[in-house]
A protein has these predicted regions:
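Gram-negative bacterial Sec-dependent N-terminal signal peptides
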Residues: 1-31
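Gram-negative and organellar
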Residues: 30-75, 83, 90-96, 103-107, ...
């Protein structure tokens, strides 16, 4: 694996061009334009970008003096009178990332009834060459939204994102490219580039805001529930507001792939029409690990504080946040690419939790969680995943302690016309350690005297448009449905939520 500590882009592109199937030794000196005069496909949409970009054997150039030469040289003035030749020169220049050639051809092509898609691609290339990275990224995202299988443009987007210091977004594009059927040398090069991104030690900031529309913010059973003459103490409550989150993180690279990391997470909810459910939390993480292009192992001790107005236990007009609980623990996170198409992600966490209010201290205890997810990416436009989860909460009062086992299934897709979707379904069982009431308790329903067992169902569907950006922010609409059935009727509920998410990497 090559040493890419000083992240440079010229060597990277020189290797890409070497591997490219359509290579043109263009000098572009003295405004003389070499033109590939071989017969192209009739329409650009019928070309196969992946085939051209990732073919391993470059086509040998024929002598320009030969009568059968496939390349001719024209001045800009001569080329301007031949729109067909402009197009034949522009397409390979775009696919081969020939920024100088595209910069020369763009003004000519723009005056010749240009194809809007090719014009936008050329503008993206020129914007990147001129250092207008925000504009270039915006145009490339629109291009990928329209043609998600256009791998040369996706690769150019990844480079533009890296140059613009949008490291996580760049890695996401490179990982999508790895799922394609690429030659081994190019896969190695992409891995090396991911390694180089990993060695950047700049601060990363990620945050977002969700609009919340809650019909059952307190997870109460349906209105009118009555069993054995008993009615639940709570009724479903509505709430509208915002949730927000922000993450700050910084890595310090050490030798041989090791690193230390600090991160801070801030999360909260604010309901303008039901403040008693407002909440706020902070979590600080400090640890380290090891990573390369295929593997990342990270061990992060953490401390966390949680503030809450009080929920159902608070007065109707309450709105002051109070310290509710504090936690500390350790998190182990392992990501490993089994192949270019298969990835395994495992997270283990141990937590000690203590409640501040005396009446809640019988819930003090610890918890263990394990989450294992297998991801399959057949290509850069699609992924599937299956996950298994285990969570165990131990408390002083056994009626509050439980064990939860779950499974998740998901599918993500980049569609044509710029639409992207993500679907996740989940199922879990939750079994408590002890009944809520003793068997000889008189004033308690019978279902309080047996161990509670729940079945939990969930569906999440998110949709967004990849080319819709404002200041680097992509809005996403999510519908979330949760349903719980139980042998305790007072713990049964269903919950529909629709929220609009605005998030951004800074």
């Amino acid at each position: 694996m090559m040493n890419l500590k000083p992240l440079t882009f010229l060597p990277f592109f020189s290797r890409l061009v070497f591997l490219s199937g359509v290579i043109y030794n263009t000098a572009w000196a003295n405004t003389v334009i070499p033109v590939d005069n071989s017969r192209p496909d009739e329409t650009f949409s019928r070309t196969s970008p992946k085939q051209h970009l990732f073919s391993q054997k470059p086509k040998p150039a024929e002598p320009t003096s030969s009568a059968s030469s496939q390349q001719i040289s024209l001045t800009i003035e001569q080329l301007a009178s031949r729109p067909d030749l402009v197009l034949r020169a522009l397409i390979p220049a775009l696919k081969n990332n020939d920024m100088r050639g595209v910069e020369i051809l763009l003004p000519i092509y723009a005056k010749q009834s240009p194809d809007p898609f090719l014009l936008k691609w050329a503008q993206a290339v020129v914007a990147r060459k001129q250092g207008k990275l925000n504009e270039s990224v915006r145009l490339y995202r629109q291009i990928i939204a329209e043609k998600p299988n256009l791998q040369p443009a996706r690769l150019q987007l990844a480079i533009a994102l890296t140059q613009n210091r949008e490291n996580e977004a760049a890695k996401a594009q490179l990982n999508q490219l790895r799922s394609e059927n690429l030659p081994a040398p190019l896969l190695t090069l992409i891995d090396s580039y991911i390694d180089a991104i990993n060695q950047r030690d700049s601060w990363n900031v990620y945050g977002g805001v969700n609009y919340l529309h809650e019909n059952n913010v307190n997870n109460a059973p349906p209105k009118g529930t009555k069993v054995e003459g008993f009615t639940p103490s709570s009724q479903p409550e509505k709430a509208h507001g915002l949730s927000y989150f922000i993450n700050f993180s910084k890595n310090w690279s050490l030798a041989h792939g090791f690193f230390t990391e600090f991160s801070a997470d801030i999360n909260g909810k604010y309901y303008w029409d039901n403040h008693k459910y407002d909440e706020f939390s902070t979590r600080l993480n400090l640890g380290g690990g090891y990573r390369n292009a295929k593997t990342e192992v990270k061990l992060m001790p953490f401390v966390e504080q949680f503030w809450y107005v009080g929920g159902e236990n608070a007065t109707k007009d309450a709105r002051t946040l109070h310290r509710y609980s504090k936690s500390s623990g350790i998190n182990l996170d392992v990501d490993y690419w089994l192949t270019p198409n298969w990835k395994m992600s495992t997270v283990l966490e141990y937590t000690e939790q203590r409640y501040i209010q005396p009446q809640r201290q019988n819930s003090n205890g610890n918890s263990y969680s394990v989450s294992n997810t297998l991801i399959y990416m057949p290509n850069s436009q699609q992924f599937w995943f299956v996950g298994l989860d285990y969570y165990q909460k131990n408390t002083q009062l056994k009626a509050y302690a439980f064990e939860r086992q779950g499974i998740r299934l998901g599918w993500g897709q980049e569609w044509s016309k710029g639409i992207s979707t993500r679907l996740q379904t989940s199922y879990a069982t939750r079994t408590y350690q002890a009944p809520s009431a003793e068997k000889n308790t008189i004033f308690a329903p019978s279902f309080f005297k047996v161990v509670q067992k729940n079945r939990e169902y969930g569906v999440n569907f998110t949709i967004w448009h990849r080319s819709v950006h404002w200041l680097g922010i992509t809005p996403k609409i999510t519908w979330a449905y949760q349903k719980t059935t139980s042998n305790n009727p007072f713990s049964e509920y269903d919950r529909n939520r629709i929220y609009l998410t605005f998030s951004k990497n800074f």
